[in-house]
């Protein structure tokens, strides 16, 4: 005879466990109210007989109900009460927070799993430990209460991977493209303080780093900004510097040529750009967010974003050049040695203006290549290929959109509305064109293709059957992510939803309209390897290669 355990598995009925449980309850009541050994064995025999008479395997809860009733039938009400209490306590132990040991090991720096989990975090630092402690609580809630059992089981068995469960308890999204242009041009609010349009490039850079830190503290994934959104402030600084220079020269009663004045202005401007870029570089590697780490930030460098505005494009080129030069140099560590900083990541776009010798900005591409050879950044995007592949509604091949990834990997899908979804985010820089800045990713789930392949035993029909079953699990898990964000109020992260980073919704307004219609994305990843193997019917010596792309 078998019974069904709480985890769903079947085991052989063991009468000794019933005897032991009743005996424990019996031993804590006064002697006058105790059951005899014969009575305890009779209760166990009765339960065994009832279970044996059933035409199906009974589960543990049903059996415990039988035990309670049998004790009550003997008139041993105090023993029954103690048994019920024992049962309740055991239930609490099963459902109680199971994170105590993990949290204690975190605090004492004995948790090897956490030490190896994230190279961007130092688990010995108090601020990081606080984030990890909160993460352990979130993981526990997620696995015990928030996710369906089949998803938890699949995750624990490695069939799928439910990413970032340490943040799932809160209503947080993954990664995004920050609408820095809207925030700088039209103002924002940081920690209850109104931040108006900056009046210089260096101030714009400083505000940008504050925005980045605030955004990073309200999501768990990476973010990307564009240097194009900082470029308009170069000319603002240029004009301000020119006014200052002219005033200084007037006070000195000096009248140099216009050419000399322009030379002085451009020299001071270059110094300001250098300081501004340095602010971004050093702030990003020294800022500490509530996640216990520096912001995961990508900087996008695309001359084509300046359009036909040659002044803006020229100023953008100066910023890009300075960004590449400083990244090539690196930053000093505590020993004073120049090293490669982890952030910001850099993305450089190859385009007609910079891709070959003789083009106006080829010098930037050579500098980028030199930087990559030494610092492994920037990464590169082909404008030509993106315009072929990333087609928003109404666009044709070769005339698509060019934009960066969100953080390090995930790309938004093209704008299926073709017009920025009629500005449902209420952005103040809406222009009716395809929209990317201000959009985001809801979360990620990964399917383990290697496990699918191994489980199939080399049978391709079985492979696809298992693959479809696992995809159904992934869909269930992804819908959990989507549904977790539904109903989230803009008040949960004002910098994101109210003050321009992603939207300018009203206070108390749900973000739901941004979760549908392709405005935001949700990601299915895959873990797999490329296998080289000879199939059963391949002639000896022949090489057969199977590739699977999702």
What are these regions (language model features)?
Residues 1-110:
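Charged, amphipathic alpha-helical regulatory modules used
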Residues 89-518, 539-542, 546-550:
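Conserved catalytic cores of very large enzyme subunits
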Residues 232, 301, 523-538:
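Contiguous, well-ordered alpha-helical segments that form the cores/surfaces of helical PPI scaffolds
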Residues 45-52, 297-305, 310, 531-534:
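Short, hydrophobic beta-strand segments
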Residues 2, 12, 298-300, 446-448, ...:
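Structured core elements
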Residues 13, 17, 42, 62, ...:
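Generic recognition of stable, solvent-exposed alpha-helical segments in well-folded globular domains
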Residues 13, 58, 516-523:
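Structural motif
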